[in-house]
């Protein structure tokens, strides 16, 4: 099967200040004061809200306004492009009654497409990496979409990645179509025709800076192009998370890695991203971005998502040098609904080191301040990469006390974990074959805890996590073992009297 590149050269002929646009224009005509024919008509016309408390606390003099895209009916900025791509496909005769829409996505485009598919009567299959939140999955299921998960660690062009899996499905399913947000001109055009115009009118033509996260690049490219046409002096600021390569700086190309913030950043350059329209790139990190999102919620009452925090952090970094008479607009792409079990949860933030743990021994438990080294647990054997097949791994897991296998490339440091549930799911869904090496089903994101941590801290982490990986902080984070709630319970019941255990 020929792989369709999501980063192939763009054929767009748009030029700044051209007399005529080469594209079909779709303006927004919905009237919110009247009855609407369906929910899709309600997409767009999101409010522009002034930030007050946060700029004041940071000593920012310029005005900062937030475009609240999370107030779209599907909960994100991606509602706009989903509807636009469907409209364009229908007009071209590519999407007809009975068709199935397939889309590789980080979730929000999928939700927008599933919502539109529900209204229009199409079937919908969404292919998304496992990193994405359970809340997005639940929303997609509620809208009637089918969902296929792919390994987060898979590189964008690998057969296991969401793009390849979607293309494979499209070949197998009759009357199916991939609208392909990475290359579809309707992605940036939705923002060129509507979002940018809304911002311009809301600001009454007075806007000096636009700050937005870059994912597929459609949002910032479409808005940026239109605003540059309307006012050439506007500065377009793009936000790229550390671990992504969208920022064209030389360092960024060697920084490909995992990051928690969803919906922005990629390990390839999507076709629809026009980096020429961007004046400055700001790199952001998970810690600052997710805490900034919590700050937007707590201090401004804006129920936004994690990538909104990245936009805020980028804005604050440049706003400190911007004079009082200037005006900045930031895009808040999605909302809190998608992340209730992620950055909204203090447990989740603590276990990833983004918040200082709150470990108070309120019940005066005798074991609370004891070290992990007091626990009795077996160190799992470390398996070499590319030595065990999925079939062999399933057999090993079924016959072992542990439900986990540990992969290492040097027999000292852990590279990833294999769980029976995950491996079985991958085999059943066809993501991996029984004859594949088990590394393809390896999980690289897990909670790591230092050997010097207390049992109280571990017990708090294990309230939400099924297990934690213990590393030796005195010996270059060498793998020590895996601890779950059973190990702590076993220690308590073995070393404390039954009365003491019950009372404390």
Curated annotation (Swiss-Prot):
Single GO cellular component term: cytoplasm
Residues reported to bind pyridoxal 5'-phosphate: 108, 215-219, 307
Cofactor: pyridoxal 5'-phosphate
Pathway: Amino-acid biosynthesis; L-cysteine biosynthesis; L-cysteine from L-homocysteine and L-serine: step 1/2
Entry's family note: Belongs to the cysteine synthase/cystathionine beta-synthase family.
PANTHER family: CYSTATHIONINE BETA-SYNTHASE
Name of the protein this chain belongs to: Cystathionine beta-synthase
Organism: Apis mellifera (Honeybee)
Lineage: Eukaryota, Metazoa, Ecdysozoa, Arthropoda, Hexapoda
């Amino acid at each position: 099967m020929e792989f369709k590149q999501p980063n192939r050269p763009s054929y767009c002929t748009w030029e700044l200040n051209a007399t005529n646009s080469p594209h079909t224009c779709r303006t927004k005509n919905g009237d919110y004061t009247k009855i609407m024919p369906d929910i899709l008509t309600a997409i767009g016309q999101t409010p522009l809200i002034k930030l007050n408390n946060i700029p004041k606390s940071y000593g920012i003099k310029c005005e900062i306004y937030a475009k609240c895209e999370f107030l779209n009916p599907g909960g994100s900025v991606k509602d706009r492009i989903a509807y636009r791509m469907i409209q364009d496909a229908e007009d071209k005769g590519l999407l007809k009654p009975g068709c199935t829409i397939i889309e590789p996505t980080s979730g929000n485009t999928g939700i927008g497409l599933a919502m539109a598919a529900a209204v229009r009567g199409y079937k919908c299959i969404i292919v998304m990496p496992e990193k994405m939140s359970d809340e997005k999955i639940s929303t997609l299921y509620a809208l009637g979409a089918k969902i296929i998960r792919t390994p987060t660690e898979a590189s964008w062009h690998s057969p296991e990645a969401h793009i390849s899996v979607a293309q494979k499905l499209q070949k197998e399913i009759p009357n199916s179509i991939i609208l392909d947000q990475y290359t579809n001109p309707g992605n940036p055009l939705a923002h060129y025709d509507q979002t940018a115009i809304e911002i311009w009118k809301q600001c009454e033509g007075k806007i000096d800076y636009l700050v937005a996260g870059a994912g597929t690049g459609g949002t910032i490219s479409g808005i940026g192009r239109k605003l540059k046409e309307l006012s050439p002096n506007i500065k377009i600021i793009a936000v790229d998370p550390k671990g992504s390569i969208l920022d064209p700086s030389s360092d960024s190309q060697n920084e490909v890695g995992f990051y928690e913030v969803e919906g922005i950043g990629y390990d390839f350059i999507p076709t629809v991203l026009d980096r020429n329209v961007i004046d400055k790139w700001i790199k952001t990190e998970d810690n600052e971005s997710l805490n900034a999102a919590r700050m937007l919620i707590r201090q401004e009452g804006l129920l936004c998502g994690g990538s909104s925090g990245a936009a805020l952090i980028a804005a604050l970094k440049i706003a400190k040098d911007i004079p009082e008479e200037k005006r900045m607009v930031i895009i808040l792409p999605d909302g809190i609904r998608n992340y209730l079990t992620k950055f909204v949860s203090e447990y989740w933030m603590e276990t990833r080191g983004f918040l200082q743990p709150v470990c108070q021994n309120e019940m005066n438990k005798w074991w609370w301040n004891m070290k992990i080294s007091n626990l009795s647990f077996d160190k799992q054997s470390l398996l070499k990469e590319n030595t065990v097949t999925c079939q062999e791994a399933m057999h090993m897991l079924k016959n072992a006390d542990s439900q986990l296998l540990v992969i290492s490339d040097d027999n000292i440091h852990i590279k990833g974990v294999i769980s029976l549930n995950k491996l079985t799911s991958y085999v059943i869904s066809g993501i991996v074959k029984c004859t594949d090496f088990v590394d393809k089903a390896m999980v690289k994101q897990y909670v790591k805890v230092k050997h010097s941590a207390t049992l109280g801290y571990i017990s708090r982490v294990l309230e939400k996590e099924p297990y934690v990986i213990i590393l030796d902080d005195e010996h270059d984070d060498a793998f020590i073992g895996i601890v779950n709630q059973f190990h702590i319970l076993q220690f308590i019941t073995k070393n404390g009297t039954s009365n003491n255990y019950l009372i404390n």
